Amino acid sequence: MKVVLDTNALMMPVELDVRLFDELDRIMPPGYELFVPEAVLNELATLSSGRGKEATAASVGADLAERATPVEHEAAYADDAVLEVARELGATVVTNDRPLRDRLFEAGIPVIGLRGHNTLERNEP
């Protein structure tokens, strides 16, 4: 099974105290593969150049993204890229971005999002 990581998913460990990879291991079948769109990597790099908690979260997110396979795409914006890559790969997306989640559901793409304080849950469209 393939999983695409969104920018805010990679920032969850710092911002929301979510043990991202432990949670994915808990809810996904063994052998799942992680992918990250290039636009997400670019967004993390931009955010990490700032100051404060968001910059720290983005910096940690960029480090965590190294566990995923980078994917090139046509879309210019990170959310569009996540949708494009998920469609192409037939993947589930990890995001806590409500507008993106709604777009993914409309496209028939499953979403893993926050449930409760720091637990992830997979939802079908």
Predicted regions and their residues:
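Nuclease catalytic cores that cleave nucleic-acid phosphodiester bonds
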Residues: A39-P125
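Domain-level signal for Mg2+-assisted phosphodiester chemistry and nucleotide/NA-binding surfaces
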Residues: M1-R67
